[in-house]
C-alpha cells in the first residue's frame, strides 16, 4: 500500500520553524499528495466495492455449483443403481431368452412329431375307412346269406314237423297195441313168476345143504390136521431124544459128520431150536367153527393179508410167541431137509371164524387149472390159506383182501322191486360181509359161507380190494352159471 500522507497539523509545525516560502511549497506539495491520496482512496473504495460485489457473485455461484455437484452425485448414484438393475434385468432376459430358445426347439421337435403322428393317423383313418367299407360289403353278404338260410331251415322245420306228427300218430297207435298185448300177457307173467319163485327156493335149499356138507368136511379136515400135528410133534420129540442119545454116545459126533459129510453142523442149536418149538406148541384148546365172522373190527387187518415174504434167511432169531402154523425152514447145511425138521406144528387156534391149517397139508395151495362146473348157485364161499414162520409172512391171497364177495350179473331174477336180492336164511343168517382175520396174520385157513337173507348185498368196507368172482352163463341155458372166486393162492368153485 502507499504511504500514509502527513497530516496538516504536523506540516504546520514544521513550517513554523522554516521560512514562509518553503512552507508554501510544502503545503502545496502536501495538498497535492492529499489529493492524490484522496483520489487513490476513492479508487480503492470503488475497487473494493466492485470486488465485494464480485465476491458475493462468486460465492453465490460457488453455492450453486456445490448444489449442482450434490445433485450430480445423487443423480450419479441413482444412475449407477439403475444401471445395476438394468444389468441384472439384462442377465434375467438372457436366461429367459435361452429358456425360450430351448422351448422353441422342443416345440419345433414336438411339432414335427405331431405332424408325423397326424400323417400316421390320417393313414390309419384311410385304412379304417377302407376296412369299414369291406366289412360293410361282407355284412351285407352275410345278411343276404342269413336270409337264405333262414328260408331254407324254415322249410326243413316245416318238413320235420310234418314227419314228427306222422311219427307221433304211428307211435301212439303202436303203444296202444303194445298196451293191449301187455294186458293180455299179465296172467302168463304171474304164472311164470310163481314158478320162478318156487325154483329159487329149491335152489336156496340146495345151496344150504351144500354149505353144511362143506362145513362138515372142513371140521373133519381140522381134526385130521390136529392129529397130524400131534403125530409130528411126537416124531420131533423122538428125533431130539435120538440126537441127544447119539451125542452122549458119540461126543465127537459133529467132528465125524464134518469129516464124513464135509459139512459143519451145530447139533446144540438144532436141539435148542426144536425144544423151543416143542415148548411153544400146544394142543389144549379145541378148534371151533364159527359160521359168520365179526367184520366191524377186522378192517385193520386188510393190509396185512397181502404182505410179501419177509425174514426168509435160515436160522434167524425168533420171538417168543405161540405158533399156530407149521413151517418147514431150510435145514442147516449138511443135513437133509427131511431128516431134522426145523419147526413143529402147534394146535390149531381159532379166532372168530379162523381155522389154522398147516401149509404142507392144505389142498388149496394150488389153484385149479380149469373151473369146475356148478349150476344154480346162490351162496358165496371162499377159502383162504395163510401162514407165517420165523417172522415171515406168507399170504396166498395175493393182492386181494377178499373183503367183498358179490356176484356180478347183468340180471338177477331173484331181485325184488327195490333192487335188493332176496336171500334165504338157514339157522343163523350169514351176511355176505367182510372176511378178515383177527389172528395177527398167523397161519390159518379162513372159511366163510354166506347165504343171502334179504339184506343189501353191499358190504360195509367198500374201499378195500375185492376178491373177484367170474360168472359165466351157458348161452343155450341161462339158468346155469359157473361162478368162481379168484384168489392169488387158490380158487374154489361154488
UniProtKB/Swiss-Prot annotation:
Residue spans of biased composition, Low complexity class: 13-25, 385-403, 429-462
Entries under InterPro entries matching the protein: She3
Record membrane topology: Peripheral membrane protein
Main location: endoplasmic reticulum
Compartment(s) where it occurs, according to its Swiss-Prot or TrEMBL record: Endoplasmic reticulum membrane
Record keywords, A-Z: Coiled coil, Endoplasmic reticulum, Membrane, mRNA transport, RNA-binding, Transport
One GO molecular-function entry: RNA binding
GO cellular component: endoplasmic reticulum membrane
Role of this protein: RNA-binding protein that binds specific mRNAs including the ASH1 mRNA, coding for a repressor of the HO endonuclease. Part of the mRNA localization machinery that restricts accumulation of certain proteins to the bud and in the daughter cell. Required for the delivery of cortical endoplasmic reticulum into the emerging bud.
Family in the record: Belongs to the SHE3 family.
Stated name of the protein: SWI5-dependent HO expression protein 3
